[in-house]
């Protein structure tokens, strides 16, 4: 059924298709229909970051930036749902067109630029949702906030979402906000992590609960840079790392229509690059920090490969767009079939 739906949706512009899909998934969630249409995946419980997940396959941030369809996505069988990226103030993002499909490569290029309705609107949607499962909220900085003041934006968002999130993801790796990726390195990263960790401690006392913090990183790093990031995350007391965001590389899409568009590339071409980052992280972290893997999962076996590489959880984005809800169950089944450690 999804194959037919995809054929119809792909006749529309990518952003129109995205918005319509979000509306349909949201409506299905409100009516309780999504769970009837999709066969529920097996229960494969896993405990990560002190949280109990019904299965290790989640929705990656970016598909539901404003929390418009939380219940709908949950009913499709995701073990957890991550919404955002959200910023302190609403912002329109980059000019359209800003999403491009590359179906020959099962890939997407986007330069959305953190378009969202702001953290207050997102929280209104979270409070209206019935979902009681694991909810991640992904936070970023506004486009017009100088990079040297980015920590202020992250703290504003953290303060607001803390009481409503199961975990919070700090996005320092989108390629579509100028200067953002510089926050992944050196003193900039150290200062950001220290500020976040201190605020997390303060908020834990205020709210009587500790909400884990995850940092989402880019795939466009050397092994040495990845190791330094891993060490910084451990030293600062972060709770998880999400690997990875989209890539600036165009390997795998050379010569394709839209292959030279600016923005971040996701989908099948980023798979090996992202999985390599997971392996480097796993070797360095040695179990001290869990890894959430995202990037290029278009078949169930790819999810299992991420777990085998050292991840504890996986997330879907582009693969979900190309393959539909069936990919959730296929990924859960493939992970469940892995030999037990």
Swiss-Prot record:
Membrane-protein topology: Peripheral membrane protein
Catalytic activity: (S)-dihydroorotate + a quinone = orotate + a quinol
Top-level taxon of origin: Bacteria
Cofactor note: Binds 1 FMN per subunit.
GO BP annotations listed: 'de novo' pyrimidine nucleobase biosynthetic process; 'de novo' UMP biosynthetic process
Keywords associated with the record: Cell membrane, Flavoprotein, FMN, Membrane, Oxidoreductase, Pyrimidine biosynthesis
A GO cellular component entry from the record: plasma membrane
Subcellular location field: Cell membrane
Cofactor(s) it depends on: FMN
Signal peptide: none
Pathway(s) annotated for this protein in UniProt: Pyrimidine metabolism; UMP biosynthesis via de novo pathway; orotate from (S)-dihydroorotate (quinone route): step 1/1
Claim: Flavoprotein is one of the keywords in the record: yes
PANTHER family: DIHYDROOROTATE DEHYDROGENASE (QUINONE), MITOCHONDRIAL, DIHYDROOROTATE DEHYDROGENASE (QUINONE), MITOCHONDRIAL-RELATED
Protein name: Dihydroorotate dehydrogenase (quinone)
Organism of provenance: Pseudomonas fluorescens (strain SBW25)
Gene: pyrD
